[in-house]
Amino acid sequence: MERPIDGFIWLDWVVEKLIEKHGVDPEEAEEAFFNKPYKVRKASSGKYLLYGRSSDGRYLFVVFVWEGRRVKVLSAREMEPDERRYYGQK
């Protein structure tokens, strides 16, 4: 990531949603920010979309916002097929 990350902010309800609804562990979502290659796109309302992989090789789609130099994860799930195609493009 071009911007240095000084940590992550996790809200309890987000962690619950990731685990219960999407089956994604917060540590997996964090790994996607450091495992190359990854892609980041700016979305609306100051949100960013990260397309990356966990250390176990899961293809993850992560929605986040910057809070200073920390990342606040809003959602994370496995990529859909069209997102995997986008991620695979150079």
Question: Locations of the language-model features?
Answer:
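Ribonuclease/tRNase effector modules and their secretory precursors
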Residues: 1-90
